[in-house]
Structures are given as C-alpha cells and as structure tokens.
Curated annotation (Swiss-Prot):
InterPro entries the UniProt entry points to: CobS (IPR003805)
EC number(s) per entry: 2.7.8.26
Pathway where it operates: Cofactor biosynthesis; adenosylcobalamin biosynthesis; adenosylcobalamin from cob(II)yrinate a,c-diamide: step 7/7
Residues that span the membrane, as ranges: 34-54, 59-79, 113-133, 138-158, 194-214
Protein's UniProt name: Adenosylcobinamide-GDP ribazoletransferase
Family to which this protein belongs: Belongs to the CobS family.
Keywords (A to Z) from UniProt: Cell inner membrane, Cell membrane, Cobalamin biosynthesis, Magnesium, Membrane, Transferase, Transmembrane, Transmembrane helix
Organism: Escherichia coli O17:K52:H18 (strain UMN026 / ExPEC)
Example GO BP: cobalamin biosynthetic process
Swiss-Prot/TrEMBL cofactor(s): Mg(2+)
Membrane topology: Multi-pass membrane protein
Subcellular location field: Cell inner membrane
Gene that encodes it: cobS
Length: 247
C-alpha cells in the first residue's frame, strides 16, 4: 500500500519522491491507486493552506490567496489546469467529436482554454479571500477541497470509457470497479467531515459530487468518453465547486 501511495504521488504531482519508494509497481496496477487520490489531495491542500497562513499576516488575504493557489498549481506541475484548458478548447470548439479530441491533444492554448484558466484561477483566489474574511478555516477548507475534488474524479472513471485509443488517462478510466469507487468517495467524505465538522464539509462534498457527475455525463455525451484532460478539468472544477459550496 505504501509503494502504491508513493507511486501515485510521483505520478500525479511534482513533489519529490525517492525513486526506490515508488519503483517496482507494475503500470497495469496503477488503477488501484485511485484510493490514494483523496490522501494525496489532502497533502496538497494542507501545504497550500500552510502557505496561506504563513503569508496572510505579512501580505494580507488577497496575496496570500494568490500564492496559495500558485503553490497548488506548481505542486501538480499545472497538470490539471492544462487538462482544464485543453478540455475547454476542444468542447467549446463546436466541431465534430474527432476534431474536438484532436484540438484537445494540441499543445497550443486556445481562446476558450485561456478564458477557462483565467476564470478558474481568479475564482479560486476570490473565493479563498472571501472564506478568510468570513473567518472560515482556510487550512482545513483547502485540504478538504483538494481531497474531495480528487476523490470525486472517480465518478469520471467508473463505468466510463476512454475516448482515445491510448493515453495516460487510460490507466484509470474504465479500469476501476464499484468497490474502489466507494472506498475513494468514502475516504474523501471522512476527510471532509473531520476537517469541516457540523456536516458543512459533507454537504459541500455532496454538491461537488452532483456537479462532477453532471460534468461527466455532459463530457461523455460530447466526447464519447473521458480522457486525462477531462479528469484534470474535473479536479480543478471540483476544487472550485467545493470552496464555493462552503460560502
């Protein structure tokens, strides 16, 4: 289990992991790592929250929120933000399904992708600032948001098909079973309930689950399935929806 966690941490983040801790795991078994997603999100969110707390006293709430969002993006190498941009470029191109997938594979940033990045990043900064001004615990909120967003991404993997013939997303999409999905969502719910007691966190997770489920169905209808890019988009939007639900 520990090797699986380190392998997933190395796979979906840019945090330094000693190679000997993550080596030796068959790539075909990576799908089992979905259950570690909420824990990895918890770690990323906690680090981002600590950055906010450390900078708030010196720079004020808005700049602390800016740097916490920046650190979160850097820890993932902008991987999920890139997926969000590619997904929006493809889906909003109003082309055929095959052409949408081609556009999503293009490394160049389009207008829709750029607008999506600006909106989501700016929205996160504003929501974090508002939560802080309302006296909400930012460390717990960010940790829970990152855990839940990565946990609910399982909804785009279970009983979904991969829209391409090959790609990194194929490691998870259509490969996880009902038990793994329930365990992943259960862990995310536990983290949300513990970090944000009084059902506040659980209620925000329910809202996030509904939003991600609807997103998954819309993407399935539009693209014929999911890709690694759509998983990244779901994680980014899941974080934002969860934080908005806390307001």
């Amino acid at each position: 289990m520990s090797k699986l966690f380190w392998a997933m941490l190395s796979f979906i983040t840019r945090l330094p992991v000693p190679r000997r801790w993550s080596q030796g795991l068959d790539f075909e078994h990576y799908s089992r790592g979905i259950i570690t997603f909420p824990l990895i999100g918890l770690l990323l969110g906690a680090i981002s929250g600590l950055v906010f707390m450390a900078l708030q006293a010196w720079f004020g709430v808005p700049l602390a929120a800016l740097f916490s969002v920046l650190v979160l993006a850097l820890m993932t190498g902008g991987f999920h933000l890139d997926g969000l941009a590619d997904t929006c470029d493809g889906v909003f191109s109003a082309r055929s399904r095959d052409r949408m997938l081609e556009i999503m594979r293009d490394s160049r940033l389009g207008t829709h992708g750029g607008l999506a990045l600006i909106f989501v990043v700016l929205a996160k900064i504003l929501v974090l600032s508002e939560l802080a001004l309302r006296g909400e615990p930012i460390l717990a909120s960010l940790a829970a948001a990152c855990a839940v967003s990565r946990g609910t991404a399982a909804l785009l993997m279970y009983r979904h098909r991969y829209a391409r013939e090959e790609g990194l997303g194929n490691v998870f999409i259509g490969k996880i079973d009902g038990r793994q999905t329930c365990v992943t969502l259960g862990l995310a719910a536990i983290f949300a309930a513990v970090l944000l007691p009084g059902m506040h966190g659980v209620a925000a997770m329910v809202v996030t689950m509904v939003a991600i489920f609807i997103l998954g169905q819309l993407l399935k209808r539009t693209l014929g399935g999911q890709t690694g890019d759509t998983l990244g988009a779901a994680i980014e939007l899941g974080e934002l929806v969860f934080l908005l639900a806390l307001l």
